[in-house]
């Protein structure tokens, strides 16, 4: 940190342009108003595709970084408005169409439902009996558990929150309009990173966490303590009563009677009745102790509030990001981070690339924590919801990571300036890209042959009737000893590091089964040869995804094959006529291919999760012990390719295939429909543009003959457009197929 005399620093001011862009509905109503070419209207059918491709490509509308920044800023408010409207809809469904109050009174026997299908031509078959005399579609979003954790006890509260969501959405829409048309920030405001860090860290994350901690302490904890004790939700005081009447809370948490005295006398241990450090899960709800999570959010708030005061603005004290970056260089890294500050303050694509990669990775980490440390009451025993949120956060993470690579490549093509990046880290990575990519390629080949080879060996030995020669827990063992050591360490360590804690951080490390209502919430997850094998398939598929995406970024500007690639742009089909073998080489094509491998990687990850949990974790608990859904067949079945096909895909597809005539029949139809969407994608991916252009011209000839020729000339999709439509349907079809397969199965057996 440095302290500088104030006169050296340019003082930070909030500067805006008043009324920079007039609000014109006439202009907005004109399709393609953002582009001179598109505004002329369509000559061919390509126009509508270009309209969609370029509507949000602000770089193509203008070269003015200030205007681009304002458009991005304004679009963020639009995004927030959409999120608030969506949230409002979720809360409204909870208020209007759900059995939330019934579920709250008996969450172990009644299933969550927030959608009732109207009887038009027999669809009411979808309204299954979810218990408590309610017929509806069983939902797996986890909202009921979240509402219970936040202390919502009635449908009126859900209505109020839904209205609040709409009010917030309106505010966001207004803010998006206001900050583009009425008071638009100047470029220097967007580039003032220290203020931005201070405000986002202290305001958004610090005060945000503090507000949530406050809500948890004053509203959620007392209400949940009463709910856990079996008090009828209708008898529980309303949230504001806990706020205005301290005695009410003090009956549940005695330290409340002492007020703020322990805080100001530094006698903080007094508050340990509602800020706990228990570890493990609440045996009543199977969720984390809410007093632990309140403590966690309070601690996080303190950290972020401190972090939000670290950066130097008008007071001449604190860190400067530019100074930190430029001072940060090692003995072997040339100019180090010099030049990176300029990249990150002038290229939104560079910013977005880093944020997407980190946010995507975080989403996948969240997916793992949601089952290992289920944060909400009764979440862990709702297997459909557990499977859904794991799958959801995994897919979201994958798309974000691929998006990170996409925007890194766009940055390389559009925003990278070689003259400002001599011998810094980025330049050095680009200069030894051949070594990086060829080594990564070798790693992929090694992992691919060895991981797949282990399975092929097992399939062969199994077919030859030689189980003693297979890699398995009962023959040739390949135990994941490192993973087992980590598990054991995490199980034993709290004895030393947190001697007063009741349990380690997660029941997955070791210890006893946590059961709620006769179902397993969480228990130690034993790892063996089967996990070792599939883990290496994960390593293989992830490395291939990284290889494709990183190659796209590092070779976005040039390669030995096409030295002037940067002049061709981010997406192009081939390097012009007369240069065979230069197709599918653009940065865009690497993103396109990376998406398929992302899909491969994550399909295997969610399949692994689904089967492992059904086999080794989820199940019912009786006096005789735990009875798992698939009876622990993962260890012996998943060690062959045939086992995955027969005992996972085929065996567990029976529920979706036989769902007709039951409340799950929609999943059967979706399973078929999504397969169709997926197959439809192959039409775009396997055939070339010329095939379609030829067909179209024949069809146009027929129209001309009949004098019904269109005014807008029909044209085949461009090569890139065809691939984009193809990959979109491939992923949509694949994900929806998996969704139907998972949910029909887990709702039927879970």
Swiss-Prot record:
It catalyses: reduced [plastocyanin] + hnu + oxidized [2Fe-2S]-[ferredoxin] = oxidized [plastocyanin] + reduced [2Fe-2S]-[ferredoxin]. Chlorophyll a binds at residues 683, 691. Keywords: 4Fe-4S, Chlorophyll, Chloroplast, Chromophore, Electron transport, Iron, Iron-sulfur, Magnesium, Membrane, Metal-binding, Oxidoreductase, Photosynthesis, Photosystem I, Plastid, Thylakoid, Transmembrane, Transmembrane helix, Transport. It is a multi-pass membrane protein. It comes from the Eukaryota. Its EC number is 1.97.1.12. Gene3D superfamilies: Photosystem I PsaA/PsaB (1.20.1130.10). PROSITE patterns: PHOTOSYSTEM_I_PSAAB. Phylloquinone binds at residue 692. Chlorophyll a' binds at residue 675. The keyword Plastid applies. It is found in: Plastid, Chloroplast thylakoid membrane. The chain crosses the membrane at residues 72-95, 158-181, 197-221, 293-311, 348-371, 387-413, 435-457, 532-550, 590-611, 664-686, 724-744. P700 is a chlorophyll a/chlorophyll a' dimer, A0 is one or more chlorophyll a, A1 is one or both phylloquinones and FX is a shared 4Fe-4S iron-sulfur center. The PsaA/B heterodimer binds the P700 chlorophyll special pair and subsequent electron acceptors. PSI consists of a core antenna complex that captures photons, and an electron transfer chain that converts photonic excitation into a charge separation. The eukaryotic PSI reaction center is composed of at least 11 subunits. This is Photosystem I P700 chlorophyll a apoprotein A1. The lineage of its organism: Eukaryota, Viridiplantae, Streptophyta, Chlorokybophyceae, Chlorokybales.
């Amino acid at each position: 940190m440095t302290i500088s005399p104030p006169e050296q620093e340019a003082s930070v001011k909030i500067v805006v342009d008043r009324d920079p862009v007039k609000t014109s509905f006439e202009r907005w109503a004109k399709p393609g108003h953002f582009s001179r070419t598109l505004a002329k209207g369509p000559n061919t059918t390509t126009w509508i595709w270009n309209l969609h491709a370029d509507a949000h490509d602000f770089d193509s509308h203008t070269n003015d970084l200030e205007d681009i920044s304002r458009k991005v800023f304004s679009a963020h408010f639009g995004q927030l408005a959409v999120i608030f409207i969506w949230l409002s809809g979720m809360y409204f469904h909870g208020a209007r169409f759900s059995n939330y109050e019934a579920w709250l009174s008996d969450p172990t026997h009644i299933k969550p439902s927030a959608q009732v299908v109207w009887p038009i031509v027999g669809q009411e078959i979808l309204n299954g009996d979810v218990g408590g005399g309610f017929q509806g579609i069983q939902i797996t979003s986890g909202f009921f558990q979240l509402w219970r954790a936040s202390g919502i006890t009635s449908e009126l509260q859900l209505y109020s929150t839904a209205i609040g969501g709409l009010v917030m959405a309106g505010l966001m829409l207004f803010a998006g309009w206001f900050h583009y048309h009425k008071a638009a920030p100047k470029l220097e405001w967007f580039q003032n990173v220290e203020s931005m860090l201070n405000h986002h860290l202290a305001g958004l994350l610090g005060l945000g966490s503090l507000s949530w901690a406050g809500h948890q302490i004053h509203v959620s904890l007392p209400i949940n303590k009463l709910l856990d004790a079996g008090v009828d939700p209708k008898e529980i005081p309303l949230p504001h009563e806990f706020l205005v009447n301290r005695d009410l809370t003090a009956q549940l948490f005695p330290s409340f009677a002492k007020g703020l005295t322990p805080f100001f006398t530094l006698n903080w241990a007094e508050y340990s009745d509602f800020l706990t450090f228990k570890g493990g899960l609440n045996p009543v709800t199977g969720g984390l102790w809410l007093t632990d999570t309140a403590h966690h959010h309070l601690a996080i708030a303190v950290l972020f509030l401190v972090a939000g005061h670290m950066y130097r603005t008008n007071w001449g004290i604190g860190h400067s990001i530019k100074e930190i970056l430029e001072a940060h260089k090692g003995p072997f890294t040339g100019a180090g981070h010099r030049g990176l500050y300029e990249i990150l303050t002038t290229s939104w694509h560079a910013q977005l690339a880093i944020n997407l990669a980190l946010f995507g990775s975080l989403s996948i980490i969240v997916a793992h924590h949601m089952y290992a440390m289920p944060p909400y009451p009764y979440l862990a025993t709702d297997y459909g919801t557990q499977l859904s949120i794991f799958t959801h956060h995994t897919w979201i993470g994958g798309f974000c990571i691929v998006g990170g690579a996409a925007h890194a490549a766009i940055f390389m093509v559009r925003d990278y300036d070689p003259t400002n990046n001599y011998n810094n880290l980025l330049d050095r990575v680009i200069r030894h890209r051949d070594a990086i990519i060829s080594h990564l390629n070798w790693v992929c080949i090694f992992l691919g042959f060895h991981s797949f080879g282990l399975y092929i060996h097992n399939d062969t030995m199994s077919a030859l009737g030689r189980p003693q020669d297979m890699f398995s827990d009962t023959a040739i063992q390949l135990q994941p000893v490192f993973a087992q050591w980590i598990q054991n360490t995490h199980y034993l360590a709290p004895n030393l590091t947190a001697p007063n804690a009741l349990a380690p951080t997660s029941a997955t490390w070791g210890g006893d089964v946590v059961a709620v209502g006769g179902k397993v919430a969480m228990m130690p997850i034993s790892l063996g040869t089967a996990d070792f094998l599939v883990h290496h398939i994960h390593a293989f598929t992830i490395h291939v995804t990284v290889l494709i995406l990183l190659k796209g970024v590092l070779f976005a500007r040039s390669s030995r094959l096409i030295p002037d690639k940067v002049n061709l742009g981010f997406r192009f089909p081939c390097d012009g006529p007369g240069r065979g073998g230069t197709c599918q080489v653009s940065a865009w094509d690497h993103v396109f291919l990376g998406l398929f491998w992302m899909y491969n990687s994550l399909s295997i990850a969610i399949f692994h999760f689904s089967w492992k949990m059904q086999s080794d974790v989820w199940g019912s608990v009786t006096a005789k012990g735990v009875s798992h859904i698939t009876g622990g067949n993962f260890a012996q079945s998943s060690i062959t390719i045939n086992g995955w096909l027969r005992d996972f895909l085929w065996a567990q597809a029976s529920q979706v295939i036989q769902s007709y005539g039951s409340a799950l029949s929609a999943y059967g139809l979706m399973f078929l429909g999504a397969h169709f969407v997926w197959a439809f994608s192959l039409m775009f991916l396997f055939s070339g543009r010329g095939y379609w252009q030829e067909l179209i011209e024949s069809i146009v000839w027929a129209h001309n003959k009949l004098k019904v020729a269109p005014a807008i000339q029909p044209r085949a999709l461009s090569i890139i457009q065809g691939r984009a439509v193809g990959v979109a349907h491939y992923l949509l079809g694949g994900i929806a197929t998996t969704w139907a397969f998972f949910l029909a199965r887990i709702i039927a057996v879970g």
